[in-house]
């Protein structure tokens, strides 16, 4: 006890004398589970072997065993991931620690360990004292292939930290490494630098006591680079870059400030966050025209588990010399569209220039049944009531911690829930064998071998029959991308994506239905439930999960020309892609010679349905704003396909019937049966392939040369934009020859400045001239004959967002929209300085506005994110 008092006294004195001192932990455990010798990791930290006195003496015989990874990707460090301790039964570690809050970090690498254990199929629970940290947890379902995982928790402990691993039925548990680190007293429970936890949506501040545990969900260095554990301020935390969480393109600006010295204080000592966090930040930008910032927000989206409360810690520090007094920069803070702080003035609250500060907020993310992993949205928007010097906002860091519920539970659901964990393929138990057990084992093995041989024969025959129908490989994924090991829930490592048959597709990618379930969902494929018919077959409206979930069920017809190849392509593509503007594949069925794909249900059908309305009396036309929002959403989906995955994915069949609309008219790209993986190396510029697509939308350069690039999708999307504007078919015979081709007709009218005469008549009183001009510019650039003259989808997204901003700005100013004055930048087919300027400016995402107290939040579409979340092929977060 005296030693503890002396340590605390020393820390307090050092904080007074030198506020820049990092924290020195009093408890440090780095356990390399399963290893027999101490080893140093890549950062120079020393990991020790398991001390027998830390292991429970109550464990049954053979409760655990150790093994080495049979295969380890080059990007995965050997310490602590080469060795593992594997548990057959409940197993408890007991660590003697000083009273207080502790970091607990668990290290996992799901791979095969020897011949005894395949961690990919492992399901287990983890408890610490009275807290449930993980329940029926699958490491493999939580991260991409060939990645490692670190789960970080913060738990209050009296004198012993009891860590228990419990395998789920018919499964084993495992762990590679255990880390326990102490922290400053009540560092995450007392609140921000002002010792307050602001309770968002409530009038009373939130208090945290020792009955609560945390899970670190995100820790982000906003505007800066990744900060590794040894770069932290003594607690070995890991800070990610924020680029993967930003909403919109070119969101904000990062100031270029060098030589900044942070002046830590008693309220914000150096251990709160390293200098790398406080010396970097993200601003809204637009310094020369700050009023532009009133039209958008700085927005981040973070996927979290529904049904939990979260502590969101925001870090701030004013490091720009021009912000040197109170009132220079004032902004509002929102979480999930709820106002959390109306007037945030970092200079005033922190006390001045280069003085760091941090605030804590408690945010509840309700389980509303719409999503298992909703986005926790963080918005910063300028506060304009007091006319600050700069309409701007600033943020340096974000930490998001999940709070345990009243039962002490922190465990969320696995990304793909399963009714029960799969049994281990090989789970031998060490112990004394008996000869009487040998004969039954031999009989079982022989019988299984015969059954397996018969099954393989059937599969081979089916596959040969399918390949006879189609010998073109639509997805070339033979190249094995490099791996990456990272921290926490945001793991962007990838592994081999070799094509698999549908029946062997991992269940964590999508759900496999039996034909009985499919027939039950569609009332045995009842004809009146058909909601669409295409080249693949019929699409049925159905219900799964006892009628709780509406789905779209696409069934391959025996006479379909597309056949099994497109079925496999779409299954292979969509099972690995997750984006809010791509239709979600829920599962598939390949029983009884049936080929069925199950998607999320899109209540508002296709974009074509709403452009070419059958019943114009009961089906109102889409407004110009809604058309822009739909186009932006579809463009973001294509943008993700082109730049957000490990390799470029080319859709090849973009058209209005393949853009679906959900209940909120959010656009989602669908039908990936013709999709191809683009160039897989820097030396490749295109893919040579047989021409496929839909007449009218087909890229003429692709048709002539059979050379496929992502610019082919850009062309098809440009045709969609023209349909949205003019609301007429691409080809018409009952019109004069000069009007027969939509693309030529629009180009001709654009050059003659008469586009206002050919747009959809329903838009005449709604569309604004400046918005239409920019929309036409980008649409016509998309449909240039030469692919090199077409813009990338990044530019298309930005231009459409800008068109939406121009429309809303003009509406606010009550511009006269009856007279449309088009000012084309030049003849179609040329690029002028005016067009270059259109795609070189910087702006943020623009959306509708809502008002809370006097603070205006510009509400963007949170579905555009990014994140987006965790999936196996993510490579460039900014492309989200």
Swiss-Prot record:
The chain crosses the membrane at residues 441-461. Keywords: ATP-binding, Glycoprotein, Kinase, Membrane, Nucleotide-binding, Serine/threonine-protein kinase, Signal, Transferase, Transmembrane, Transmembrane helix. GO terms for molecular function: ATP binding; protein serine/threonine kinase activity; transmembrane receptor protein tyrosine kinase activity. Residues 472-487, 494-505 have a biased composition (Polar residues). Residues 1-21 form the signal peptide. It is an enzyme of class 2 (transferase). The keyword Methyltransferase does not apply. GO terms for cellular component: membrane; plastid. It comes from the Eukaryota. Glycans are attached at residues 46, 136, 158, 210, 256, 263, 297, 324. Pfam families: Malectin_like, PK_Tyr_Ser-Thr. ATP binds at residues 531-539, 554. Its main location: membrane. Residues 462-880 are cytoplasmic. One of its GO terms (biological process) is response to metal ion. The keyword Coiled coil does not apply. Residues 525-810 form the Protein kinase domain. Residues 22-440 are extracellular. Belongs to the protein kinase superfamily. Ser/Thr protein kinase family. This is Probable receptor-like protein kinase At5g38990. It comes from Arabidopsis thaliana. The lineage of its organism: Eukaryota, Viridiplantae, Streptophyta, Embryophyta, Tracheophyta.
């Amino acid at each position: 006890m005296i030693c503890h008092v002396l340590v605390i006294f020393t820390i307090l004195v050092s904080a007074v004398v030198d506020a820049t001192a990092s924290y020195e932990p009093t408890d440090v455990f780095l356990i390399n589970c399963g290893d027999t010798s101490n080893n140093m990791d890549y950062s120079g930290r020393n990991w020790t072997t398991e001390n027998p006195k830390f292991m429970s003496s109550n464990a049954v015989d053979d409760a655990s065993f150790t093994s080495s990874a049979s295969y380890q990707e080059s990007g995965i460090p050997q310490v602590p991931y080469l060795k593992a301790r594997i548990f057959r039964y409940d197993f408890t570690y007991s660590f003697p620690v000083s009273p207080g809050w502790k970091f607990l970090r668990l290290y996992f690498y799901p791979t095969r360990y020897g011949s005894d254990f395949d961690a990919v199929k492992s399901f287990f629970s983890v408890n610490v004292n009275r807290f449930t940290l993980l329940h029926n947890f699958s490491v493999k379902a939580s991260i991409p292939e060939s990645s490692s995982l670190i789960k970080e928790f913060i738990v209050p402990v009296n004198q012993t930290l009891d860590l228990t691993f419990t395998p789920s039925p018919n499964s084993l548990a495992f762990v590679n490494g255990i880390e326990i680190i102490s922290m400053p007293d009540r560092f995450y429970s007392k609140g921000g630098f002002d010792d307050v936890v602001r309770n968002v949506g409530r009038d009373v501040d939130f208090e945290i006591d020792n009955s609560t545990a945390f899970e670190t969900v995100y820790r982000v260095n906003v505007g800066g680079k990744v900060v590794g554990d040894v770069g932290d301020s003594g607690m070995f935390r890991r800070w990610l870059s924020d680029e993967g969480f930003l909403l919109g393109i070119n969101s904000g600006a990062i100031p270029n400030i060098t030589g900044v010295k942070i002046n830590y204080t008693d309220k914000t000592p150096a251990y709160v966050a390293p200098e790398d966090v406080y010396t970097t930040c993200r601003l809204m930008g637009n310094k020369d025209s700050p009023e532009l910032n009133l039209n958008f927000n700085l927005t981040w989206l973070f996927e979290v588990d529904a049904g939990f409360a979260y502590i969101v810690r925001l870090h701030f520090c004013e490091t720009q010399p021009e912000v040197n007094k109170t009132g220079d920069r004032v902004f509002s803070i929102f979480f999930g569209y709820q106002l959390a702080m109306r007037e945030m003035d970092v200079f005033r609250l922190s006390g001045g220039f280069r003085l760091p500060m941090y605030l804590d907020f408690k945010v509840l993310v309700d389980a509303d049944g719409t999503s298992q992993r909703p986005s926790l949205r963080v918005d910063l928007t300028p506060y304009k009531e007091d006319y600050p010097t700069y309409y701007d906002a600033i943020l340096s860091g974000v930490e998001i911690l999940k709070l345990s519920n009243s039962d002490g539970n922190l465990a969320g659901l696995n990304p793909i829930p399963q009714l029960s964990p799969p049994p281990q393929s090989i789970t031998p138990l060490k112990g004394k064998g008996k000869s009487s057990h040998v004969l039954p084992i031999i009989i079982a093995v022989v019988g299984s071998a015969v059954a397996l041989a018969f099954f393989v024969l059937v599969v081979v025959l089916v596959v040969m029959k399918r390949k006879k129908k189609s010998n073109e490989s639509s997805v070339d994924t033979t190249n094995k991308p490099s791996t990456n090991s990272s921290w926490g829930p945001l793991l962007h490592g990838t592994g081999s994506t070799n094509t698999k048959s549908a029946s062997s597709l991992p269940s964590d990618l999508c759900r496999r239905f039996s034909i009985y379930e499919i027939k039950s969902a569609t009332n045995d494929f009842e004809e009146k439930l058909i909601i669409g018919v295409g080249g693949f077959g019929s699409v049925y409206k159905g219900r799964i999960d006892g009628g709780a979930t509406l789905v779209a069920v696409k069934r391959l017809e025996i006479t379909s020309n597309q056949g099994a190849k497109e079925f496999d392509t779409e299954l292979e593509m969509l099972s690995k892609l997750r984006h809010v503007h791509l239709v979600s594949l829920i599962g598939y069925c390949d029983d009884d010679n049936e080929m069925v794909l199950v998607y999320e249900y899109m209540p508002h059908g296709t974009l074509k349905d709403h452009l070419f309305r059958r019943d114009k009396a009961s089906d109102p036309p889409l407004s110009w704003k809604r058309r822009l929002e739909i186009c932006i959403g579809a463009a973001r989906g294509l943008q993700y396909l082109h730049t957000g995955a490990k390799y470029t994915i080319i859709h090849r069949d973009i058209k209005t019937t393949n853009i679906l609309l959900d209940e909120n008219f959010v656009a989602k790209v669908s039908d990936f049966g013709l999709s191809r993986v683009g160039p897989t190396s820097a030396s490749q510029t295109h893919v040579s392939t047989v021409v496929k697509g839909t007449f009218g939308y087909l890229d003429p350069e692709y048709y002539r040369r059979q050379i496929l690039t992502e610019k082919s999708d850009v062309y098809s999307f440009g045709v969609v934009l023209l349909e949205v504007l003019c609301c007429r078919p691409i080809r018409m015979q009952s019109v004069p020859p000069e009007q027969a081709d939509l693309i030529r007709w629009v180009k001709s009218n654009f050059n003659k400045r008469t586009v206002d005469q050919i747009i959809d008549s329903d838009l005449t009183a709604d569309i604004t001239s400046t918005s239409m001009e920019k929309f036409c510019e980008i649409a016509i650039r998309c449909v240039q004959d030469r692919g090199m003259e077409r813009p990338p989808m990044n530019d298309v997204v930005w231009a459409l967002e800008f068109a939406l901003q121009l429309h809303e700005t003009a509406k606010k100013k009550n511009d006269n929209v009856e007279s449309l004055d088009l000012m084309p930048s030049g003849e179609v087919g040329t690029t002028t300085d005016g067009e270059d300027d259109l795609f070189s400016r910087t702006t943020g995402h623009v959306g509708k506005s809502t008002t809370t107290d006097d603070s205006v939040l510009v509400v963007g579409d949170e579905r555009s994110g990014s994140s987006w979340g965790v999936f196996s092929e993510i490579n460039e977060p900014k492309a989200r």
